[in-house]
Structures are given as structure tokens and as C-alpha cells.
Regions:
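Walker A/P-loop nucleotide-binding motif
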Residues: 97-113
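Residue-level preference for the first positions of well-ordered beta-strands
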Residues: 99-101, 161, 194
Length: 212
């Protein structure tokens, strides 16, 4: 029993990046009660850090509202064979770097589904960012003007899941389309991407410029 407790203390210290002196001292001089207290304190600290990490991920994601899959109606949703409802709700697609296009008319819950999937990803420790396409293009243009575009691209590259809402709602000019294309290219096979759109695929060329 004591050996198991000592091993658990060492594991906690490694995960918390604490000195190995703590488990050594506990093992050599601590009583069973003291070891039990230290293990509980370490486990509480790990739990608190995990809670704070999830809160930080949620805040950094930039969701416009809080949505979950609780009570979500799949009545108008058709999932492809490669994606199960469980994969969607448990963020299994993020682990596989799978991309999702949520297509359909306004008002059927595309944004709700995207946010719910993103929030679930955050609770599992995945770094996530949410933007409308217009918002992201404007931000990319601003950062380029300020000379900090590469910093933003680096931040976007570090994400596990990138959600782009309202794909195709507003045409994007040529400069904006080039910036947006670079973000999409950076995401290829390195993270998951969710797009919500009411525009059929054959008309996606109109997203980028009015004259295409």
C-alpha cells in the first residue's frame, strides 16, 4: 500500500514539474498519514490546474456564446459515414485531424453545433479558436499592417481546432483571400478545421472575390 502511494506521489510530482526531493523525503522520513496527506494535496493541485487550464482554453477560444450538445436536435442533420455522432460530441475528430464542413440553410443550428464541438474540445484540453470568416480576415489584415502577421499565424498553427463560422456569407477581396488561404494551408493535416456555410461547394469561388 505504501509503495503504491509513494509511486502515486512521484507521478503527481512529475506531472506538476516538482522536484524529486519531495517524494524522496516523503518516502524516507514521512509517516503513512503524512504521505496520504501529501498525495491528496498534490492530487488537489493537479485537479485545480486542470480546471484553470480548461477555463483558460475556453476564454482564449473566443466563443460568441456558450453552447453544448445537451438537447441538440439532429433532426435536420445528416452525418457522413466517416463521422459518428459520438465522434462529434466527444471531439474524436480532433484527435484524427478530421475536418468538418457544416452545410445548410440559415437557422438549422450549424453555429450551435460548431460551438458545442469546440467547447467539448476545450474541456478535453484541445487548443481551440473560433472566428467568423470576416472577423478573421480583418484580423489578418490588421496584423499584417502592424507587422505582427507571423505571430498571429504562429498562434493559429498551434491550435488543435480552428472554427470558421459564416464561410461564404460575405465575399472576401483578393488580399483577404490570400491571407485566408494561407491559414487554411497551414491547417492542412496538422489540426482540425470546422467550417459553417450556407453556400454549396460549387459556389465557393465567390467567397474570395466578387469577380471570380
Amino acid at each position: 500500500m505504501r509503495d503504491v502511494m509513494n509511486a502515486d506521489i512521484r507521478t503527481c510530482c512529475r506531472q506538476l514539474f516538482l522536484s524529486g526531493a519531495i517524494p524522496d523525503l516523503c518516502e524516507q522520513e514521512g509517516t503513512p498519514k503524512q504521505a496520504e496527506f501529501i498525495l491528496k494535496a498534490l492530487q488537489n493541485e493537479m485537479e485545480l490546474r486542470e480546471i484553470n487550464k480548461r477555463k483558460r482554453l475556453m476564454k482564449q477560444a473566443g466563443f460568441p456564446m456558450y453552447k453544448t450538445f445537451d438537447g441538440y436536435s439532429y433532426g435536420s442533420v445528416t452525418l457522413p459515414p466517416s463521422l459518428s455522432k459520438q465522434d462529434l460530441e466527444d471531439a474524436g475528430f480532433v484527435e484524427r485531424h478530421q475536418n468538418l464542413v457544416l452545410y445548410g440553410p440559415v437557422g438549422i443550428g450549424k453555429t450551435h453545433m460548431a460551438i458545442a464541438a469546440g467547447i467539448k474540445a476545450c474541456t478535453l484540453g484541445y487548443k481551440t479558436k473560433f472566428f467568423t470568416v470576416t472577423e478573421l480576415v480583418l484580423k489578418l489584415a490588421k496584423e499584417r499592417k502592424n507587422g505582427t502577421l507571423e505571430k498571429l499565424r504562429s498562434d493559429l498553427k498551434s491550435q488543435d481546432l480552428l472554427i470558421l463560422d459564416e464561410w461564404g456569407y460575405v465575399p472576401v477581396d483578393r488580399d483577404g483571400s490570400q491571407l485566408l488561404f494561407r491559414v487554411i494551408s497551414d491547417s492542412y493535416e496538422s489540426k482540425s478545421l470546422i467550417l459553417t456555410t450556407n453556400l454549396e461547394f460549387s459556389k465557393w469561388g465567390s467567397i474570395f472575390t466578387d469577380d471570380q
